């Protein structure tokens, strides 16, 4: 996996990520060109079940600068490309267990194809977020203390 095009850093703060999966994206030519330039935002996006497919909603891929009037719509719904068993598993988890599908990372794979890492997630309550923050602060303080002990 190469350097990410876009990353949803807030997802791990707001959700418990239970499982991750790699999905392809059905994109138009100008969307691919815009991604090659490195322009995308998946911070406010989510994946939703529409019939027997899963769509990426609210992901922002800005219009390609050198395109003509046939440019794409920036926030259109994009179909995720997954195997049927994966789709059925995700649909079951979303409908039965009340889970959410959150995009975590958008990147190019080794073959040069745009891939999206999606997470099957459960929402965190406010007290869970505080616990996560406290644990992160403790890890940071512990690392500082250990660093201070090395120099003596």
Swiss-Prot record:
Extract the Pfam families matched here.
Answer: SmpB (PF01668)
GO BP annotation list: trans-translation
Write out the entry's keywords from A to Z.
Answer: Cytoplasm, RNA-binding
Instruction: Please tell me where this protein is predominantly located.
Output: cytoplasm
Q: Which residue stretches belong to region Disordered?
A: 122-152
An example GO CC term for this entry is: cytosol
Asked if the Swiss-Prot or TrEMBL record annotates the protein with the keyword Transmembrane helix, the reply is no
Please list the GO terms describing molecular function: RNA binding
The record's annotation in CDD domains points to: SmpB
Which InterPro entries has this protein been placed in?
SmpB (IPR023620), SsrA-bd_prot (IPR000037), SsrA-bd_prot_CS (IPR020081)
Does Transmembrane helix show up as a keyword for this record? no
Cellular compartments annotated: Cytoplasm
Biased amino acid composition, Basic and acidic residues: 128-152
Signal peptide extent: none
Q: What does this protein do?
A: Required for rescue of stalled ribosomes mediated by trans-translation. Binds to transfer-messenger RNA (tmRNA), required for stable association of tmRNA with ribosomes. tmRNA and SmpB together mimic tRNA shape, replacing the anticodon stem-loop with SmpB. tmRNA is encoded by the ssrA gene; the 2 termini fold to resemble tRNA(Ala) and it encodes a 'tag peptide', a short internal open reading frame. During trans-translation Ala-aminoacylated tmRNA acts like a tRNA, entering the A-site of stalled ribosomes, displacing the stalled mRNA.
Q: Which family does the similarity line name?
A: Belongs to the SmpB family.
Please identify the protein, giving its name as recorded: SsrA-binding protein
Q: Which organism is it from?
A: Caulobacter sp. (strain K31)
